[in-house]
Protein backbone atom coordinates (compact mmCIF):
# COMPACT_ATOMS: atom_id res chain seq x y z
CA UNK A 1 0.00 0.00 0.00
CA UNK A 2 1.26 3.49 -0.74
CA UNK A 3 2.38 5.75 2.10
CA UNK A 4 -0.50 8.26 1.84
CA UNK A 5 -3.22 5.76 0.98
CA UNK A 6 -5.58 4.54 3.59
CA UNK A 7 -8.00 1.72 3.60
CA UNK A 8 -11.66 2.64 3.23
CA UNK A 9 -14.45 0.75 4.91
CA UNK A 10 -14.50 -1.35 8.01
CA UNK A 11 -11.63 -3.55 9.20
CA UNK A 12 -11.98 -7.31 8.82
CA UNK A 13 -14.83 -8.57 10.95
CA UNK A 14 -16.35 -5.09 11.20
CA UNK A 15 -19.19 -5.99 8.85
CA UNK A 16 -20.06 -8.97 11.01
CA UNK A 17 -20.09 -6.76 14.11
CA UNK A 18 -22.45 -4.25 12.49
CA UNK A 19 -24.69 -7.06 11.28
CA UNK A 20 -24.87 -8.52 14.79
CA UNK A 21 -25.69 -5.09 16.26
CA UNK A 22 -28.46 -4.51 13.71
CA UNK A 23 -29.93 -7.97 14.38
CA UNK A 24 -29.91 -7.34 18.16
CA UNK A 25 -31.65 -4.00 17.72
CA UNK A 26 -34.32 -5.62 15.53
CA UNK A 27 -34.98 -8.22 18.23
CA UNK A 28 -35.37 -5.50 20.86
CA UNK A 29 -37.78 -3.56 18.65
CA UNK A 30 -39.83 -6.70 18.00
CA UNK A 31 -40.32 -7.35 21.72
CA UNK A 32 -41.14 -3.78 22.77
CA UNK A 33 -44.73 -3.56 21.39
CA UNK A 34 -45.72 -6.82 23.12
CA UNK A 35 -44.76 -5.42 26.51
CA UNK A 36 -46.68 -2.21 25.83
CA UNK A 37 -49.82 -4.17 24.94
CA UNK A 38 -49.65 -6.12 28.19
CA UNK A 39 -49.37 -2.91 30.19
CA UNK A 40 -52.29 -1.23 28.42
CA UNK A 41 -54.94 -3.70 29.68
CA UNK A 42 -57.86 -1.85 31.26
CA UNK A 43 -58.39 -2.29 35.00
CA UNK A 44 -62.02 -3.41 34.59
CA UNK A 45 -61.03 -6.74 33.02
CA UNK A 46 -57.73 -7.18 34.85
CA UNK A 47 -57.36 -9.76 37.63
CA UNK A 48 -58.02 -8.63 41.18
CA UNK A 49 -54.41 -9.20 42.25
CA UNK A 50 -53.28 -6.36 39.97
CA UNK A 51 -55.43 -3.74 41.68
CA UNK A 52 -56.14 -5.13 45.17
CA UNK A 53 -54.20 -6.55 48.07
CA UNK A 54 -54.07 -10.34 48.02
CA UNK A 55 -53.01 -13.40 50.00
CA UNK A 56 -51.43 -16.47 48.41
CA UNK A 57 -53.72 -19.36 49.39
CA UNK A 58 -51.86 -22.17 47.59
CA UNK A 59 -48.15 -21.98 46.83
CA UNK A 60 -46.71 -22.22 43.33
CA UNK A 61 -47.35 -25.75 42.02
CA UNK A 62 -46.97 -27.48 38.65
CA UNK A 63 -50.05 -27.65 36.44
CA UNK A 64 -51.51 -30.87 35.10
CA UNK A 65 -51.57 -31.52 31.35
CA UNK A 66 -55.26 -30.64 31.27
CA UNK A 67 -54.68 -27.35 33.14
CA UNK A 68 -51.86 -26.38 30.78
CA UNK A 69 -54.21 -26.77 27.81
CA UNK A 70 -57.30 -25.24 29.40
CA UNK A 71 -56.08 -22.55 31.83
CA UNK A 72 -54.29 -19.50 30.39
CA UNK A 73 -52.42 -18.96 33.67
CA UNK A 74 -50.67 -22.33 33.25
CA UNK A 75 -49.74 -21.85 29.62
CA UNK A 76 -46.79 -19.48 30.01
CA UNK A 77 -44.81 -21.15 32.82
CA UNK A 78 -46.52 -24.47 33.56
CA UNK A 79 -46.96 -23.42 37.19
CA UNK A 80 -49.72 -21.50 38.99
CA UNK A 81 -50.69 -20.35 42.46
CA UNK A 82 -54.09 -19.69 44.01
CA UNK A 83 -54.70 -16.16 45.28
CA UNK A 84 -57.46 -14.64 47.41
CA UNK A 85 -57.99 -10.90 47.02
CA UNK A 86 -58.71 -9.36 50.42
CA UNK A 87 -61.31 -6.62 49.71
CA UNK A 88 -63.42 -8.49 47.14
CA UNK A 89 -62.86 -12.02 48.58
CA UNK A 90 -62.36 -13.35 45.04
CA UNK A 91 -60.31 -16.50 44.44
CA UNK A 92 -58.16 -16.39 41.33
CA UNK A 93 -55.17 -18.15 39.87
CA UNK A 94 -52.03 -16.55 38.50
CA UNK A 95 -48.97 -17.83 36.73
CA UNK A 96 -45.82 -18.15 38.82
CA UNK A 97 -42.22 -19.23 38.39
CA UNK A 98 -41.02 -22.09 40.58
CA UNK A 99 -37.56 -22.23 42.13
CA UNK A 100 -36.97 -25.62 40.50
CA UNK A 101 -37.79 -24.24 37.05
CA UNK A 102 -35.58 -21.18 37.65
CA UNK A 103 -32.69 -23.40 38.74
CA UNK A 104 -33.12 -25.58 35.65
CA UNK A 105 -33.17 -22.54 33.35
CA UNK A 106 -30.12 -21.07 35.10
CA UNK A 107 -28.02 -24.21 34.61
CA UNK A 108 -29.21 -24.52 31.03
CA UNK A 109 -28.03 -20.94 30.43
CA UNK A 110 -24.71 -21.58 32.19
CA UNK A 111 -24.13 -24.72 30.11
CA UNK A 112 -24.82 -22.78 26.92
CA UNK A 113 -22.41 -20.02 27.94
CA UNK A 114 -19.65 -22.53 28.74
CA UNK A 115 -20.22 -24.36 25.44
CA UNK A 116 -20.05 -21.11 23.44
CA UNK A 117 -16.93 -20.06 25.35
CA UNK A 118 -15.24 -23.38 24.55
CA UNK A 119 -16.12 -23.10 20.87
CA UNK A 120 -14.67 -19.60 20.64
CA UNK A 121 -11.59 -20.60 22.67
CA UNK A 122 -10.96 -23.37 20.14
CA UNK A 123 -11.42 -20.92 17.27
CA UNK A 124 -8.91 -18.54 18.88
CA UNK A 125 -6.38 -21.34 19.31
CA UNK A 126 -6.80 -22.46 15.70
CA UNK A 127 -6.44 -18.91 14.40
CA UNK A 128 -3.36 -18.29 16.57
CA UNK A 129 -1.72 -21.43 15.17
CA UNK A 130 -2.46 -20.27 11.61
CA UNK A 131 -0.91 -16.88 12.31
CA UNK A 132 2.13 -18.49 13.94
CA UNK A 133 2.62 -20.72 10.87
CA UNK A 134 2.41 -17.69 8.55
CA UNK A 135 4.90 -15.77 10.66
CA UNK A 136 7.32 -18.72 10.73
CA UNK A 137 6.97 -19.10 6.95
CA UNK A 138 7.79 -15.41 6.43
CA UNK A 139 10.82 -15.66 8.71
CA UNK A 140 11.97 -18.84 6.91
CA UNK A 141 11.65 -17.12 3.50
CA UNK A 142 13.61 -14.10 4.77
CA UNK A 143 16.38 -16.35 6.09
CA UNK A 144 16.51 -18.32 2.82
CA UNK A 145 16.81 -15.11 0.78
CA UNK A 146 19.98 -14.08 2.66
UniProtKB/Swiss-Prot annotation:
Residues of the signal sequence?
A: 1-30
Its main localization is membrane
Q: Which GO terms describe its biological process?
A: mitotic cell cycle; mitotic cytokinesis; positive regulation of protein kinase activity
The record's listing under InterPro entries reads: JTB
Where in the cell?
Membrane; Mitochondrion; Cytoplasm; Cytoplasm, Cytoskeleton, Microtubule organizing center, Centrosome
Q: Which residues lie on this side of the membrane: Cytoplasmic?
A: 127-146
Q: Which UniProt keywords apply?
A: Cell cycle, Cell division, Cytoplasm, Cytoskeleton, Membrane, Mitochondrion, Mitosis, Signal, Transmembrane, Transmembrane helix
Q: How does it sit in the membrane?
A: Single-pass type I membrane protein
GO CC terms in record: centrosome; cytoplasm; membrane; midbody; mitochondrion; spindle
What's one Pfam family the UniProt record gives for this protein? JTB
> Which segments does the topology annotation call Extracellular?
31-105
Instruction: Enumerate the transmembrane spans.
Output: 106-126
Q: Which GO terms describe its molecular function?
A: protein kinase binding
Q: Which family does it belong to?
A: Belongs to the JTB family.
Role according to the record = Required for normal cytokinesis during mitosis. Plays a role in the regulation of cell proliferation. May be a component of the chromosomal passenger complex (CPC), a complex that acts as a key regulator of mitosis. The CPC complex has essential functions at the centromere in ensuring correct chromosome alignment and segregation and is required for chromatin-induced microtubule stabilization and spindle assembly.
| Protein's recorded name | Protein JTB
The scientific name of the source species is: Brugia malayi (Filarial nematode worm)
